[in-house]
Design a protein with these regions (language model features):
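Gram-positive cell-envelope targeting signals
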Residues: 1-40
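Domain-terminus/edge residues, biased toward the C-terminal soluble/receptor-binding domains
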Residues: 29-30, 198-199, 210-215, 219-310
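Hydrophobic side chains in beta-strands
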Residues: 25, 82, 131, 297-299, ...
Length: 310
């Protein structure tokens, strides 16, 4: 959400996630110094059902309202979650149903709808979009590309720019392409959230810049990233450590900007435990949401899969 240097500072402070991962390695360590997001005081959520009409619980970990699991080391976090996706066992759960601001983790849902539109044939990765204006934001340091009116680029570059380096303007451009307006696209986001069981989530934009009425929960984000990971393209995008973001400027000249992921585990700036690989992921940073990261992990030896959120 913010400029790259601030995101880098956040990733270097992500000691808590390393310690969450180390729990998988059976060290049992934790940290009290990392806040994953800002909890909202807007009521108590009902218990989630043990299983639903579509058998949701058979595919997902189930955590009761207020249930804390091995959470003593995470009292300094507003939310923390670690799930063994192979067994559906919850290893860590702290405030997973408390409402939080998702920041750029919002873009996971945006990515879902874009990939669904591609798979349905409504749009193509190769479609070229020409901008009629520069997309601007009230937040002076909102992460955005250099695109202005008259620039053109492919849907692929818009999607990759959105998911890899968190360009907020790319989200707005894609939303308007698919739904005609960002507001209509948010209606689609909220409908999709309900469809997958993320019923304590409400989106009012496609990028995650702060709005008091834009919120989710750690558990809902768990459901959302699982939906995101159903798409093969998600893994292609999330595996990249660099990408050449390419567009044609208003004068007809090709411009190439090499972008890097906001996840510094991928760039190598933060060490990642040996023997594990990263699947889908998304970071988030705003003044109100503070710093967040959700990530899929795989034990390369056993094939066991995990989802971690801090």
């Amino acid at each position: 959400m913010f400029n790259q240097s601030r995101i880098g500072k956040y990733m270097r402070r992500s000691i808590s996630l390393i310690l969450v991962l180390s729990m998988v390695l059976l060290t049992g360590c934790g940290s009290k110094t990392y806040k994953a997001g800002k909890q909202l005081d807007i009521g108590v959520l009902p218990d989630l059902p043990v299983y639903g009409e579509l058998g949701m619980a058979y595919d997902n970990a189930v955590i009761a309202q207020g249930e804390e699991i091995d959470a003593a080391n995470y009292n300094g976090c507003y939310a923390a979650m670690l799930v063994d996706e192979t067994t559906k066992d919850t290893i860590v759960a702290h405030n997973v149903h408390g409402k939080i601001y998702p920041a750029s983790m919002t873009k996971i849902m945006t990515g879902i709808l874009v990939m669904e539109s591609i798979e349905k044939g409504d749009i193509s990765l190769d479609d070229v979009v020409t901008l009629n204006r520069k997309v601007t934001f009230d937040d002076w340091d909102a992460m955005a590309s250099d695109l202005v009116g008259g620039c053109s680029l492919t849907v692929k570059n818009l999607l990759y720019g959105l998911m890899i380096t968190s360009y907020n303007d790319c989200g707005v451009i894609l939303a308007e392409l698919i739904a005609g307006s960002e507001s209509a696209f948010c209606d689609m986001m909220n409908e999709k959230a309900k469809e997958i069981g993320a019923t304590n989530t409400h989106f009012v934009n496609c990028h995650g810049l702060h709005d008091d009425d834009h919120y989710t929960t750690a558990y809902d984000l768990y459901l959302i990233i699982k939906e995101f990971s159903k798409h093969d393209l998600a893994y292609v995008i999330d595996s990249l450590d660099t990408y050449d973001f390419t567009y044609t400027d208003a004068d007809g000249n090709e411009q190439v900007v090499t972008i890097e992921p906001t996840n510094e585990f991928l760039t190598g700036e933060v060490n990642f435990p040996d023997g594990y690989s990263i699947g889908s992921w998304k970071t988030g940073t705003t003044e109100e949401a503070l710093n967040c990261l959700i990530m899929e992990l795989k034990n390369d030896s056993t094939g066991e899969e995990y989802i971690a959120l801090v």
